[in-house]
Amino acid sequence: MRTSQYLFSTLKETPNDAQVVSHQLMLRAGMIRPMASGLYNWLPTGIKVLKKVENIIREEMNKGGAIEVLMPVVQPAELWQESGRWNDYGAELLRFVDRGSRDFVLGPTHEEVITDLVRREVSSYKQLPLNLYQIQTKFRDEVRPRFGVMRSREFVMKDAYSFHVDKASLQETYDVMYQVYSNIFTRLGLDFRAVQADTGSIGGSASHEFQVLASSGEDDVVFSTESDFAANIELAEAVAVGERQAPTAEMQLVDTPNAKTINELVEQFNLPIGKTVKTLIVKGATEEQPLVALVLRGDHELNEIKAQKHPLVADPLEFADEAEIKAKIGAGVGSLGVINLNVPAIIDRSVAVMSDFGCGANIDGKHYFNVNWERDAAMPEVADLRNVVEGDPSPDGKGVLQIKRGIEVGHIFQLGTKYSEAMKATVQGEDGKPLVMTMGCYGIGVTRVVAAAIEQHHDERGIIWPSDEIAPFTVAIVPMNMHKSESVQQFSEELYRTLKAQGVDVIFDDRKERPGVMFADMELIGVPHMVVIGEKNLANGEIEYKNRRTGEKQMIAKDQLLAFLKENVKA
């Protein structure tokens, strides 16, 4: 491609409303342009990258035995009503009525559509297992679109759905897809972790997220220093450290009128925060027990996903308000504790091994110090309620935990029969009876992958694509003063034609621009291999080569240039 025939839309300045690096660089590199909140036009440079990512995904999915289909973005409401998600999905589901007064949605996902398709097309267990995928536009009416294409309202997604006669067959395909995803992200050159995850609104049992490690990520990714253990912080098991020690002091009731929070208590009474506990009151799951207390160490955070899975706790988790707490317990939020508590309590594992700790007295303006289990309070039910912290023991007993930020780019689920049962998707089983199909679901955010690659791979000059395979162009020809030098123009034209004939994705900068502008643009869009052709070097039989990824510069003999590029460039 010649720049003179290309829409080369780079910007010198960073737009003020772009918060994260990927958004800034995608705008500056001329990859995207905003149209409305959360909606973007993809320009030629961006679409080249997007299509290359799609092709890698497509190739690896095909290798894994999946079959490509394409389903409509517009979906009839009846399918969502049939699955039960019409009322459950929430405001992200964009609904509309057509001219025939029929309800439709813009698809945020395609579980209903694929289940309907397969129940119509597949009738016998002999046709299973079946794994179908598509690369298609999705729409989710995000309440606050942000971070460019990282969290936009319209995006491209690869979603696959597998159908099976039983869980054993599903597990086989799930394992294959786990490996396929690992192959995809490895081929893309990304530093990622496959982590245990919560199934969320999709439903089902087993689930893994594929997280690209980046400081701008929205998720906390937990992994061991000495094993393959990795999990989203929502699911990472927190292990209690040490054993409970014997009491060393008598319990005291202390006036604490100005200590309404753990931090105020610690500061005013010079207590180690690890020797305090906090009591959180949440809604219970039953009318008989409308309120439940969750008790954590003062320096730990409640893990809401873990808490709401407890049978006593309402799902979704909901905190009780001040009036409810005061009416039931008789004290305000800042004075709650485990002594004489009149609602069921669940304590975190780390609280169960504490001794001589401080907690609220369930009397406003008072706390107990030097509290000990069994001596001063009966030991309540113990459960894993908290988020892990860096340095915690790994739950597999190998090493300690590290925590890094991650960008979720892929997610695989074992759905089971959640959708097939609701939508009566059955086949004739081996025994001749109707058999509800067991399902798996496998998604990759294609547009998000592009942004995640930039978040992880960039410098002050622009994008550094982690793989030649996804760069918009693999080679840039940058001729110095070509329009004033016949030898430079002749060599550049000949090199361009040769590389094109060899199938190299090459951009030839034939603009009448200063060399500095040309270099800056090619570095900004992240072309991994730059060939600089100058009149003086050419006369000496040499060509300058620059590697965007390593920063290396070297002179290559003119007659060795093609061989050098063939060896170093992945076309």
UniProtKB/Swiss-Prot annotation:
GO terms for cellular component: cytosol. It is found in: Cytoplasm. GO terms for molecular function: aminoacyl-tRNA deacylase activity; ATP binding; proline-tRNA ligase activity. It comes from the Bacteria. The keyword Protein biosynthesis applies. One of its GO terms (biological process) is prolyl-tRNA aminoacylation. Keywords: Aminoacyl-tRNA synthetase, ATP-binding, Cytoplasm, Ligase, Nucleotide-binding, Protein biosynthesis. Its EC number is 6.1.1.15. InterPro entries: aa-tRNA-synt_IIb, aa-tRNA-synth_II, aa-tRNA-synth_II/BPL/LPL, Anticodon-bd, Anticodon-bd_dom_sf, Pro-tRNA-ligase_IIa, Pro-tRNA-synth_IIa_bac-type, Pro-tRNA-Synthase_IIa_type1. Its main location: cytoplasm. It is an enzyme of class 6 (ligase). It catalyses: tRNA(Pro) + L-proline + ATP = L-prolyl-tRNA(Pro) + AMP + diphosphate. Consists of three domains: the N-terminal catalytic domain, the editing domain and the C-terminal anticodon-binding domain. Belongs to the class-II aminoacyl-tRNA synthetase family. ProS type 1 subfamily. Catalyzes the attachment of proline to tRNA(Pro) in a two-step reaction: proline is first activated by ATP to form Pro-AMP and then transferred to the acceptor end of tRNA(Pro). As ProRS can inadvertently accommodate and process non-cognate amino acids such as alanine and cysteine, to avoid such errors it has two additional distinct editing activities against alanine. One activity is designated as 'pretransfer' editing and involves the tRNA(Pro)-independent hydrolysis of activated Ala-AMP. Homodimer. PANTHER family: MITOCHONDRIAL RIBOSOME PROTEIN L39/PROLYL-TRNA LIGASE FAMILY MEMBER (PTHR42753), PROLINE--TRNA LIGASE (PTHR42753:SF2). This is Proline--tRNA ligase. It comes from Actinobacillus pleuropneumoniae serotype 5b (strain L20). The gene is proS.
